[in-house]
């Protein structure tokens, strides 16, 4: 294992032969996790069928979802901030449906944070959230592209970038936790 880290721990007080009080110590040998040879066992991914994933995705949704025959610009799903609703095209395949609905759902979640809603920024953040959810739940995310990052990532202020990325992480976590609860039922 290499060399352990030695930690000195007090073992209590004792009285010496001359009447003075002393403190006894024990040396504890500990190892850093990087010094071990054990490998973490990867949890086998739990695969859910597409219907269960979609059901979990829309479990306790923040806004109503309506099906439509077509949407502008060939979109599969769209969050409309004025109507506070998500519109979804009929006839999509399950993987595309998950990706599109998760993105629209993330936009709806981001719009409800109370901050000023900017569709451009929210669209990129929702794209990131959708990618995270797809990776977590085993959906094919090979079509996702991050070649054009949002303007908020082009700033020199690391605190601003951290704040924006935290919002992406928190939104993904909220939706993921909701989905996990729905899938447990």
Question: Language-model segments: what does each one mean?
Answer:
Residues 1-185:
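N-terminal accessory/interface modules of nucleic-acid-binding and processing proteins
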């Amino acid at each position: 294992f290499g060399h352990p880290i030695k930690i000195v721990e007090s073992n209590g007080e004792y009285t010496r032969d001359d009447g003075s009080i002393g403190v006894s110590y024990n040396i504890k040998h500990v190892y850093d996790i990087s010094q071990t040879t054990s490998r973490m066992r990867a949890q086998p991914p739990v695969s859910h069928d597409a219907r269960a994933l979609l059901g979990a995705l829309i479990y306790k949704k923040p806004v109503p979802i309506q099906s439509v025959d077509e949407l502008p610009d060939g979109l599969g799903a769209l969050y409309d901030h004025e109507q506070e609703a998500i519109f979804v095209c009929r006839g999509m395949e399950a993987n595309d449906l998950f990706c599109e609905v998760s993105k629209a759902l993330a936009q709806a979640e981001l719009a409800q944070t109370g901050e000023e809603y900017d569709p451009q920024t929210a669209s990129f953040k929702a794209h990131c959230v959708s990618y995270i959810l797809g990776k977590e739940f085993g959906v094919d995310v090979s079509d996702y592209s991050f070649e054009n990052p949002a303007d908020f990532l082009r700033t020199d202020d690391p605190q601003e970038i951290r704040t924006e990325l935290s919002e992406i992480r928190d939104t993904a976590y909220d939706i993921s936790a909701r989905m996990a609860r729905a899938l447990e039922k």
